[in-house]
């Protein structure tokens, strides 16, 4: 039996940050008719997969994110239907999609198990469930956890995904890949974190020197910049 890959393994495939759309295409192939991206945020990944999937729908509970996604799709001339909807209560009939996707979103679901059950419900027989999640390990995770610790929610998402096996879903593939994240400075990373969620400011303010020291200690130094490998897991499941 092939041993499980660990986040520090050198054999984990290295991909440029932002190459997850190409990775999805490699796994899903061309010609899929209809895909749903659950928790799509501002829709960058969703717009990317529209290049090789016939009809693409993206949903998110945040109206602001959906408005930005629609504006970007219009500006780029990409045909994607963005809707405000919860991943735990999807407004489609059983078996409506032949691909359902969680791209870095399953751990953000209030109830991952319920969201996965809904995903399985709207997935057609023979369809593919594509789940990409950041792994709760490695130096980037350690550095970021000081202001946004997602260890518990990522673990809960992983447990929920595995609990679906044998309930009409089977795992076709499990892949680990790493992307290099490079920041010009600590302040560059801080700005990135605050853009993601302003609520993280309180963590920075509580121990500014400690957060900075920890971040810089964990980073690789590359030409005066601070770099990390972030590890992602991509699971591809099929519906019988």
Residue ranges: model-predicted function:
Residues 88-99:
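A short acidic, Gly/Pro-enriched loop at the edge of an enzyme's catalytic core
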Residues 112, 168-240:
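Conserved Class I S-adenosyl-L-methionine
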Residues 13-33:
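Conserved alpha-helix/loop element of class I SAM-dependent methyltransferases that forms part
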Residues 113-125:
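A short glycine-rich, Lys/Arg-flanked "PGG" loop and its adjoining helix->strand segment in the class I
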């Amino acid at each position: 039996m092939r041993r499980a890959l660990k986040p520090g393994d050198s054999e984990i495939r290295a991909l440029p940050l932002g190459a997850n759309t190409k990775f999805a295409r490699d796994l899903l192939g061309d010609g899929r008719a209809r895909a749903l991206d659950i928790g799509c945020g501002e829709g960058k990944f969703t717009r990317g997969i529209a290049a090789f999937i016939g009809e693409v729908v993206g949903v998110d509970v945040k109206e602001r994110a959906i408005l930005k996604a629609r504006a970007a799709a219009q500006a780029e001339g990409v045909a994607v239907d963005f809707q405000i909807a919860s991943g735990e209560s999807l407004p489609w009939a059983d078996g409506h999609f032949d691909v359902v996707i969680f791209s870095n979103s399953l751990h953000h679901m209030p109830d991952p198990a319920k969201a996965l059950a809904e995903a399985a419900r709207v997935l057609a027989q023979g369809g593919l469930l594509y789940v990409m999640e950041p792994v709760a390990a490695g130096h980037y995770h350690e550095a970021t956890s000081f202001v946004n610790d997602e260890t518990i929610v990522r673990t809960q998402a992983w447990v929920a995904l595995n609990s679906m096996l044998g309930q009409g879903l089977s795992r076709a593939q499990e892949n680990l890949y790493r992307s290099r994240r490079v920041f010009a400075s600590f302040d560059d990373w801080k700005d990135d974190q605050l853009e993601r969620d302003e609520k993280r400011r309180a963590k920075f303010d509580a121990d500014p020197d400690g957060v900075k020291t920890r971040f810089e200690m964990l980073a690789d130094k590359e030409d005066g910049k601070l770099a990390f490998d972030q590890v992602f897991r991509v699971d591809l499941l099929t519906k019988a």
